[in-house]
Amino acid sequence: MQIVIPMSGFGERFRRAGYSVPKPLIEIEDKPVIAHIIDMFPGESNFIFVCNQEHLNKPAYRMAAILKEYCSSGRIVGIPPHKLGPVYAVRQIEDMLDQTRPVIVNYCDFTCYWDWGHFKQFVRDVGCVGAIPAYQGFHPHSFGNTNYAYMRETGGWVQDIQEKQPYTSNRMQEYASSGTYYFATARIMSEAFRSAMEQDLNVGGEYYVSLAYRPLLANKQPVAVYPLQHFMQWGTPEDVAEYNMWSRAFRQLVATTVVKSQTMGTVIVPMAGLGQRFAAGGYSLTKPLIPVSGQPMVAQATHDLPPAEQHVFVLRSDMQGHREVTTELTRLYPKAIIKTTDQVTEGQACTALIGLDAIAEELGDVPGPITIGACDNGALYDLTAFRSLVGDPDVDVIVWGVRGYPNAIRHPKMYGWINAKAGVIRSISVKTPLDSPTSDPIVLGTFTFRRAEDLRRVVERLIDRDGRINGEFYIDSCINDAIALGMNCRLFEVDSYLCWGTPNDLLTFEYWQSCFHKWECHPYGLEKDARVSQNTIDFLKFRYRATCPALPALMK
């Protein structure tokens, strides 16, 4: 296979974001992006790298040396800087191609999990003049604002393709090109590229490979879709940051096994919400029992809270699966207090107060510190650092937070934001972002109070002043009351925030768990993850197994 990789663009977005090397040389998983692209084609040696000559000329980039390190047989061609797109770049090296042999043009800002051998067999069996690897359905990067090349298809055959905009309002249900483009011969590619430029098929002055299929489709030539299981998008600084966040989290899940021996204080887990989004999404189990890594969600969430002497869980009596949840919690935490409320509360702060009252009634004195945590998220953090903060007698309240969480950046009005300096919290802004959502910390929904009476005081003060946000009393808001009462409130930043609070949150976690488990470039594996229930590993391996697409339907 002849493989051409146009990499002559400027990468302005990365430059503006502070990156010091061109996009193909940015390191991800300990090697440059271009190395991941080369790895997509195991056993191949006929590569042509079409580079920006200015990049080749800059000694600090070492572009030619890096390309030779990862592909010694590759041919490196420098062309003058331009803004005409990848079709123009590839046309500069057309005379280097065997016009009778197949060719792939591959962009330089992504990778995917696929079977290269299967793809080659697929195009041979199908007999198409072109094929486009693409993804459809749930892929987390599609939640961003970037649009790609989208296709109309019938039975696996492309009917139309357009750049930078979907055909419908539900782009996840459309096939989007990954950035790999196959042509049965280089001659077919060259003629398609020439036609595309003659017809002025460009977007913003750039000629994209996707649009070169339009002349082929107009002539009723068969172009197939090749569905992909996992796709890693690194086209923008935001894409890279989000990918790295998930990669770090799953690396940390298998890096060390934390032995939580010393227990202290109380953990209260409010779980009196309705969980309507999961029910609407077709989940039959009530939210706390939905499996995460083979364990009930509430068990995974509680596992990530500090080891405690006493646990309190607050449930609604009319919660679907109330009996099953109670049975499971009793099995996991035999000494736990399970408090039932007969109605939906007015918010997390009120539910936490119910839990505090329950343990006070049971034990009299409430063991401190008291940590309130949600039933639908986990966190990876330095337990020693947390205990050091708890051990500081000057600290009254600890607010758990994290920076750079992608969903908060996309939807800043859905989160609480922490205004802190040198770890000391000045205020909490609930559902209203601060100056810089990309770097300001958000509230996880986990809080630690040194004394039970302080928790009670701030919640009662919040209720007295009717400090509702969107009709609910949030513990986020209580922190402002704590500050007003003179309490020393400190920020505790976690390493990774694992959110399962909505169906999309859970699907995103499972997407990356599935991808990293299979992908040899990542160290994660289900069998290495101590949070994965041992008796469900085989089930999860089967669920996450590699898939290869079937052949398309016969063309009519």
Regions found by a protein language model. Give the residues of each.
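Alpha-helical elements of Rossmann-like donor-binding domains used by nucleotide-donor carbohydrate transfer enzymes
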Residues: R91-Q92, H118, A212, E242, ...
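Conserved N-terminal catalytic core of the sugar/cofactor nucleotidyltransferase
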Residues: Q2-S8, R13-R15, Y19, I26-E27, ...
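Active-site glycine-centered loops adjacent to acidic/histidine catalytic or metal-binding residues
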Residues: G9, D109, Q136, T236, ...
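A structural signal for short hydrophobic beta-strand segments in well-ordered beta-sheet cores
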Residues: L25, Y150-E153, V225, L289, ...
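Short glycine-enriched, charge-decorated loop/helix-capping segments at active-site entrances
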Residues: Y19-L25, M197-Q199, Y283-L289, I463-R465
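Conserved alpha/beta core of the MobA/IspD/sugar-nucleotide pyrophosphorylase nucleotidyltransferase superfamily
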Residues: I3, E174-V267, D440-M555
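A short acidic, often aromatic-flanked loop/helix-cap motif at beta-alpha or helix-coil junctions
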Residues: P81-P86, F138-P140, F231-W234, Q343-Q348, ...
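Conserved core of the sugar-phosphate nucleotidyltransferase
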Residues: Y113-D200, A379-D466, R545, L551-L554
